[in-house]
Amino acid sequence: MGIKGLAQVLSEHAPASVKHNDIKNYFGRKVAIDASMSLYQFLIQVRSQDGQQLMNEQGETTSHLMGMFYRTLRIVDNGIKPCFVFDGKPPTLKSGELAKRVARHQKAREDQEETKEVGTAEMVDRFAKRTVKVTRQHNDEAKRLLELMGIPFVNAPCEAEAQCAALARSGKVYAAASEDMDTLCFQAPVLLRHLTFSEQRKEPISEYNIEKALNGLDMSVEQFVDLCILLGCDYCEPIRGVGPARAVELIRQYGTLDRFVKEADRSKYPIPEDWPYEDARRLFLDAEVLPGEEIELKWKSPDADGIIQFLVKEKGFNEDRVKLGINRLEKASKTIPQGRLDSFFKPVPSSPKKPVDTKSKGSAKRKRDSNKGGESKKKR
């Protein structure tokens, strides 16, 4: 779900924190991509003309593999070095949101069966997309494909977005890429959205900078996280009557959620009983992640035979197209630079100016003058 209305808040209150770039602007960058979000996106978007998920002759879903293969090709074609991060176990606090999702899936399946009988094609498609769920098999097959492609991946102990943010904070990658805005709550220095969208959508990459967001909002990291919880996140249900504008106003008025919960008018703001905002805050500020510094990311040459065996012989992909994709991978692995030039230069703190030693400067000048005189004598 992410954070409700956060993109709107940043565009209004911290416009300098948001910019939109062409994918080519990220040539030479390393990016950690939320694989679980990407797979969900592929299962929804990569479909046949009749709106159904792609399948092979055995009836196995292949939308996730088609998306992972060709969207990753587009990324490496543009000189980006991706690594993918997969979800681990969900935090206990997320069980409420997960239960709601299961209920929504079940309701959507029932509605889908009804609309197949009496509804339009558009209605059937809409309800079909609500039933999408990323399974362990989808994850395992995506990991197998990435390994064959020579693209590194990381198994996060918990939330993939949090691990992407940790990799970006450690400097192992330039940015975290996800459609979930809560990646910023995990203190990703830079968040990229729309990186794994199809080229046909012609969507620019939206880049969010956390430091500029905090400056624009005039908030600390803790206040920003409190704001996001108040907006509504996966860990806490939103408070009725509190939209984006009101949430910003309340954090500025009370400073913290602690004061808001303690002092706010409950008749005006019906805060749920046992509202776990403190636990949510802790999950954002102290997420369970692998230390980014200890993770080694290695990009390798693709295993052409392995890719053909998996995608063509096992999953029924078109062999000619897959071979063209392999050629693109091999070309990218040879041409993508180790790093951008600007990554080698870090700002150096300016040292205080030293007082000018006029005496030594004068003596140096006299020495230069005498040398010049000596040289001119020699020339004569």
Swiss-Prot record:
Keyword Isomerase among record annotations: no
Enzyme class, broadest EC rank: hydrolase
InterPro entries tied to this protein: 5-3_exonuclease_C_sf, Flap_endonuc, HhH2, PIN-like_dom_sf, XPG-I_dom, XPG/Rad2, XPG_CS, XPG_DNA_repair_N
Residues where Mg(2+) 2 binds: D180, D182, D234
Location of this chain's protein in the cell: Nucleus, Nucleolus; Nucleus, Nucleoplasm; Mitochondrion
Post-translational modification as stated in the protein's UniProt record: Phosphorylated. Phosphorylation upon DNA damage induces relocalization to the nuclear plasma.
Stretches of the chain forming a coiled coil according to its record: none
Positions with biased composition (Low complexity): 342-353
Region of interest called Interaction with PCNA, as start-end residue ranges on this chain: 337-345
GO biological process: base-excision repair; DNA replication, removal of RNA primer; mitochondrial DNA metabolic process; UV-damage excision repair
EC number: 3.1.-.-
Transmembrane segment boundaries: none
GO MF entries: 5'-3' DNA exonuclease activity; 5'-3' exonuclease activity; 5'-flap endonuclease activity; DNA binding; double-stranded DNA 5'-3' DNA exonuclease activity; magnesium ion binding; single-stranded DNA 5'-3' DNA exonuclease activity
Skewed-composition ranges (Basic and acidic residues): 370-380
Region Disordered, annotated ranges: 340-380
Main location per the UniProt record: nucleus
Cofactor binding summary note: Binds 2 magnesium ions per subunit. They probably participate in the reaction catalyzed by the enzyme. May bind an additional third magnesium ion after substrate binding.
Region (I-domain): 123-254
Keywords from the named record: DNA damage, DNA repair, DNA replication, Endonuclease, Exonuclease, Hydrolase, Magnesium, Metal-binding, Mitochondrion, Nuclease, Nucleus, Phosphoprotein
Binding residues annotated for Mg(2+) 1, in chain numbering: D34, D87, E159, E161
Residue span of region N-domain: 1-105
Record's subunit section: Interacts with PCNA. Three molecules of rad2 bind to one PCNA trimer with each molecule binding to one PCNA monomer. PCNA stimulates the nuclease activity without altering cleavage specificity.
Functional description taken from the UniProt entry: Structure-specific nuclease with 5'-flap endonuclease and 5'-3' exonuclease activities involved in DNA replication and repair. During DNA replication, cleaves the 5'-overhanging flap structure that is generated by displacement synthesis when DNA polymerase encounters the 5'-end of a downstream Okazaki fragment. It enters the flap from the 5'-end and then tracks to cleave the flap base, leaving a nick for ligation. Also involved in the long patch base excision repair (LP-BER) pathway, by cleaving within the apurinic/apyrimidinic (AP) site-terminated flap.
Name of the protein: Flap endonuclease 1
Species assigned in the record: Schizosaccharomyces pombe (strain 972 / ATCC 24843)
